[in-house]
Amino acid sequence: MLEDEYQLDFFKNNGFVRKQCQKCGTFFWTRDPERNTCGDAPCDPYSFIGSPVFSREFNISEMREYYLSFFEARGHTRINRYPVVARWRDDIYLTIASIADFQPFVTSGQVPPPANPLTISQPCIRLNDLDSVGRSGRHLTNFEMMAHHAFNRRDNEIYWKEHTLELCDELLNSLKVNPLAVTYKEEPWAGGGNAGPCVEVIVHGLELATLVFMDLKTDKKGDIEIKGETYSKMDNYIVDTGYGLERFVWASRGSPTIYDALFPGIVNELMGLAGIEHELNDSEYANILAQNARLAGFMDVSEKANLMELRKKVASSIGMTVDKLSAIMEPVEKVYAITDHTRCLTFMLGDGIIPSNVKAGYLARLVLRRTLRMMKDLDIRIPLSEIVDMHIKNMPEYPGFRENFPVIQDILESEEEKFNTTMERGRRIIQKSASHFKKTGEKIPLSQLTELYDSHGIPPEMAKEVAAEIGVGVEFPDNFYSIIGELHNKAEEKEEEVNPYAERLKHLPKTKRRFYDEPTRLEFEAVVLDVFDNHVVLDNTFFYAEGGGQPADIGTIVAEDTVYRVVDVQVYEGVILHTIENPGKELAITKGELITGKVDEKRRMTLARHHTATHIVNDAARKVLGKHIWQAGAQKFEDHSRLDLSHYKHISPEEIRQIELLANRTVMENKRVVTEWMPRTEAEQVYGFGLYQGGVPPGEKIRIVKVGDDVEACGGTHCTSTGIIGPIKILKTERIQDGVERIEFAAGTAAVRAMQKLESLLVDSSKTLSVPPEHLPVSVDRFFGEWKDLKKENERLKEELARSRVYRMLGDASEVSGLKVITEQVSGADSLELQKIATELLKTENVVALLASDFEGVKIVASAGEKAMKCGVNAGNLVREMSKIVGGGGGGKPALAMGGGTDPTRIQDALTRGLELVKTAACKEA
């Protein structure tokens, strides 16, 4: 459908011919009339290995600078890179391409670009090819996309397809690339809600660049279909190019793999630690590795590609068995993958991602644990942080990583401990799961394998090993990690909020929010635009509508001397609804009427204090805990607020004290709270993406709030200066999920009340112990020590009592077919006491004990000695039947079981029933 898009003067005027690849069927453009394939792997092998493509070698820094300078000299503005965690997006977690920096606001035309045209070298992370990393010789999880972008409008074109191709060809010519070796492959592109024609730039089997001409947007009613989605034309159209920095370096060096080109020192170090460096010096091994490298393009593990079949292709081409090739290549490929993954982790953690079980943190842990698993396979016994440190030493252009290394190191050590714990308990979990499938004769399915990984962190390789010991197979696809990465790569699509009043409100203008202009004003006049049910719409308002974790204002509306209480305020597509406390009759308010509104001052100020304090506590936490701290959620109430922070371990009491001290210092400095509306692009350039701690607001302009050193895009109400907040008191902290710590605090009068409450508890405790408050710690320690001693003595006496009871019970036991049967109600005994007695009685092999107690309902315990069990007595069956009589249930093992119920009046009936069952089950032999 896009075929006409490629009929360009650039191709016609520069000696290109359009051909169709004889292997994959794709159309491409070439200057070589003899060429019949598209040039891309696997249609063509890598022919640049050992034969570099460019006239000189480049390292990463040199290549990046060459590219950016090339485009700067041709009218492009160089801009700084964005983080690899997409803080400005709510639809994806990671920056997957340079164009992601500008989606959705710039690409949609809502916001101007930071420069036009521009050039950038953007670090990216993609995990959809995770299983090909290390194997194909070219795949990376973390790569830099060098790019130049032009943002065109129908009335203002910067440049389009012709000039983009001219620039690409000029760049390759400047690097002395043989023009006959270059192919431009036609391939439609789609991503991030946009699409368009695309040209892939191939040289000697390697895709060096992708030139996308984005002029389509997703549209359910669109008439253009690409990859199963329908699209329509955009008002603007964008040049979206991506040149692979690492691939350019590889092509310049002709190394066996991209990993050898980028990280030769780290690869050699890991080869040595894995004990395979000596093999690389062997001429036969070196020859096999070289041949494998040229054919590694086959090793693209995808949903349709089977790893063993791909390996067979390469083995056949080399002329050796697949088993021998696998034995040689798998350790080497794992070293390559570890090298790649650790650089990926350097960017992830360096840019502030905290490993966890959700969102970007899940993806970081996915890469991290896959790395640890491969290190375990190769018996590489160094901390993960040592390899990350090697990468940081090679990246002086990222000084923030070195500055943040202590935190990165701490995170990695913590994650290694968690991984080792998972491995220890994982074996039992797998054995249980495998036993279930062994009974059914089935393999452990992919769904269960995914569940084991997602819920318990158990790697599929481990599941396969343990299941094999039990004789159970596992459905373990070669692209398992790619599947997992793809499942968790995108944010969950938010359900579109249904506007129940859409029809009613669609013709009304947006309500003017005057509380932004005059934050201290609480009384105002407004014109009524609409009234329905118990809702009122005004032309302007000082009532804050609920949003951003802040509850709505309340107050009153006065109309014709009637006072109406406003109990809720909500906003729907810019129109604010004021909800009146149910009047029980139709509101006597009419359209066009002038009303007086009054906001409840106490609630407004309390919430403003807590909202402003949230900014301060967040900033203090970042200063104390590290720059990785990111707001994961916040909610303000009248009596307290809570702030959720991304953090990799529990916040210590000392850290809490430091955070509280810093927060109150900011309050006492009485700094002015500054608010201003700024163009989004300008705000991002000035303040960075920390602006979006509380979420990403829409619009070309965003409201910036500066509280002390904290600067955020925020739409809430705030104090005009920090001194108005009053004291800030942290009430408690807790871990609400892996990787997220919650701080609860109070501000202003609420903080004073909280401190008074704590003081009352202190005074009451002092009175109880008859000591002054300052002596409480010593007294509590003393009483606690005495309590522990008494508890031990109590346990000793209980055991002694149990033994004496055992002797008496044995003397009172009934004889049943050579067995001694004890049936007794032990008043007031809990389950543990009954269990101790029953366990003691187990030492006598011909004893059956049936014990019951009226403690908290009914407790029942039964035990059967070895001889009793041989005679057919089963304690589990006895407890099950006895528990039914007292209105409960229970069970256990043949030797010892526990149960109970709710009806203590039937205890004797239960004991009698137990005795009958013993008589029925017991052997007749003495």
Swiss-Prot record:
Record field: catalytic activity: tRNA(Ala) + L-alanine + ATP = L-alanyl-tRNA(Ala) + AMP + diphosphate
Subcellular localization(s) per the UniProt record: Cytoplasm
Keyword rRNA-binding appears in the UniProt entry: no
Family matches, as SUPFAM superfamilies: Class II aaRS and biotin synthetases, Putative anticodon-binding domain of alanyl-tRNA synthetase (AlaRS), ThrRS/AlaRS common domain, Translation proteins
Signal peptide boundaries: none
GO cellular component terms, A-Z: cytoplasm
EC number: 6.1.1.7
First-tier enzyme category under EC: ligase
Keywords, sorted A to Z: Aminoacyl-tRNA synthetase, ATP-binding, Cytoplasm, Ligase, Metal-binding, Nucleotide-binding, Protein biosynthesis, RNA-binding, tRNA-binding, Zinc
Cofactor: Zn(2+)
UniProt-listed InterPro entries: aa-tRNA-synth_II/BPL/LPL (IPR045864), Ala-tRNA-lgiase_IIc (IPR002318), Ala-tRNA-ligase_IIc_anticod-bd (IPR018162), Ala-tRNA-synth_IIc_core (IPR018165), Ala-tRNA-synth_IIc_N (IPR018164), Ala-tRNA_lgiase_arc (IPR022429), Ala-tRNA_ligase (IPR050058), DHHA1_dom (IPR003156)
Chain sites annotated for binding Zn(2+): H611, H615, C714, H718
GO molecular function, one term: aminoacyl-tRNA deacylase activity
Cofactor remark from the record: Binds 1 zinc ion per subunit.
Domain of life: Archaea
GO biological process, one term: alanyl-tRNA aminoacylation
Alphabetized PANTHER family for the sequence: ALANINE--TRNA LIGASE, CYTOPLASMIC, ALANYL-TRNA SYNTHETASE
Domain remark from Swiss-Prot or TrEMBL: Consists of three domains; the N-terminal catalytic domain, the editing domain and the C-terminal C-Ala domain. The editing domain removes incorrectly charged amino acids, while the C-Ala domain, along with tRNA(Ala), serves as a bridge to cooperatively bring together the editing and aminoacylation centers thus stimulating deacylation of misacylated tRNAs.
Family: Belongs to the class-II aminoacyl-tRNA synthetase family.
Purpose: Catalyzes the attachment of alanine to tRNA(Ala) in a two-step reaction: alanine is first activated by ATP to form Ala-AMP and then transferred to the acceptor end of tRNA(Ala). Also edits incorrectly charged Ser-tRNA(Ala) and Gly-tRNA(Ala) via its editing domain.
Entry protein name: Alanine--tRNA ligase
Name of the gene encoding the protein in the UniProt record: alaS
